[in-house]
Amino acid sequence: MLKQRTIKSIVKTVGIGLHSGRKVELTLRPAAPGTGIVFSRVDLPTPVDIPASAMSIGDTRLASVLQKDGARVSTIEHLMSACAGLGIDNLYVDVTAEEIPIMDGSAASFVFLIQSAGIEEQNAPKRFIKVKKPVEVRDGDKFARLDPFFGFKLKFTIDFRHPAVDKTGQALEVDFANTSYVREIARARTFGFAHEVEMMRELGLARGGSMDNAIVLDEYRILNNDGLRYDDEFVKHKMLDAIGDLYVVGHPLLASYTAYKSGHGLNNALLRELLAHEDAYEIVTFDDPQAAPSGFAFDTQTAFA
């Protein structure tokens, strides 16, 4: 049986919120089979638990934001991406602010945290959402699409007319049957343009943003002294985001995802469109792990490896 997974022990870290600039304490705790990934605002007078789900995503303008009973947890996509990449099904995420800390702007810190805690298989079958029919959403020239596929692969195209981005490649296709999430995707950082950062700060946003947690570009070049971690880091980060956005559906997808200029809002709209058509998907499990797609028949250290 291909089993559900959680972490072995509690692990904690401290970082800053990308937009608030405030210190955030983050605690990851093991969770029982069938729990899913549950975020908890432990700083509130009465803590609020917000299970990750497609229907709980509210604001998507700058990040994926979970909302419930007036409580928010923002910028969940990098942590969710790490959970997807490591095959974590069940987890409690305690936070002391309304933002998940940005860390270094990628998913690498969350991968390290989860691996430090250890990964534990649980005596319950891992559940997948198998896409049975194509589903697509569009917004002008932007689109995101899911097609039936026995595994998980993504094709993402960006279109930033910028000399530094043009040189790195604007399209990427990855099949996790033969690609390691940890090695090839997790370290890709978020990016932004210097003039946009200044505008956002005037609006009280991006107060925690710096070249320690983002790739920053001016009109012509990358400003970070250390350059890029991957030759195609820009499109890889958009793929990292998409993996996290899609994982809020509650289970790993067995599907092919194709996107052009998609973002958090369109990714969430795609999940809602999928869930609105009961004939477009089914929940499946695998009694024999070897019968699962090769990207998911992993050991307890890595997924998509």
Curated annotation (Swiss-Prot):
Pathway: Glycolipid biosynthesis; lipid IV(A) biosynthesis; lipid IV(A) from (3R)-3-hydroxytetradecanoyl-[acyl-carrier-protein] and UDP-N-acetyl-alpha-D-glucosamine: step 2/6. The keyword Hydrolase applies. The active site is at residue 264. It catalyses: a UDP-3-O-[(3R)-3-hydroxyacyl]-N-acetyl-alpha-D-glucosamine + H2O = a UDP-3-O-[(3R)-3-hydroxyacyl]-alpha-D-glucosamine + acetate. GO terms for cellular component: membrane. Its cofactor is Zn(2+). Its EC number is 3.5.1.108. One of its GO terms (biological process) is lipid A biosynthetic process. Zn(2+) binds at residues 78, 237, 241. InterPro entries: Ribosomal_Su5_D2-typ_SF, UDP-acyl_GlcNac_deAcase, UDP-acyl_GlcNac_deAcase_C, UDP-acyl_N-AcGlcN_deAcase_N. One of its GO terms (molecular function) is UDP-3-O-acyl-N-acetylglucosamine deacetylase activity. Pfam families: LpxC. Catalyzes the hydrolysis of UDP-3-O-myristoyl-N-acetylglucosamine to form UDP-3-O-myristoylglucosamine and acetate, the committed step in lipid A biosynthesis. This is UDP-3-O-acyl-N-acetylglucosamine deacetylase. The lineage of its organism: Bacteria, Pseudomonadati, Pseudomonadota, Betaproteobacteria, Burkholderiales.
